Amino acid sequence: MNFRIWSPLLCVLVLISAAPASAQRQVIHEERSQYRNVLVTEFNGQRCMLFNIHRGDMNQTCIDLRNPKRLVFNYTKMSFAGLLLNPEPERILVAGLGGGTIPMVMRELYPEAEIDVLEVDQAVVNVAREFFGYQE
């Protein structure tokens, strides 16, 4: 394989995949909290929460609008790996709510478990409820 041919193509693909979350997205909600700007955007069938769009921050939470229960990010899927060690948890702690996708899926998988969520920013909780269907 000729590295000279593939090198520029690889660079372009990396740059495209690292594009800021704000590229070509429609902002449907924006509010200033005590800690940061909280934004909700929609693009290509996904609704996402992000912070500080002007700094180029990436998405914190995304849901697939066609299938809201599907976990979009690999890291959210990997957060369930610990359950291999304890397949029937009685108590679960989630640090940081985001859009609430992790605790909502946990609630569906483990309806008997006590799930505690730590979130310091009330604006994030409000946005999770209004735009991501989060229910405590």
Which residues does each predicted region cover?
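Intrinsic disorder/low-complexity segments
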Residues: 1, 19-22
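Bacterial N-terminal signal peptides
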Residues: 8-17
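N-terminal auxiliary segments of SAM/dcSAM-dependent transferases
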Residues: 21-49
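The AdoMet/dcAdoMet-binding core of the Class I SAM-like
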Residues: 25, 70-136
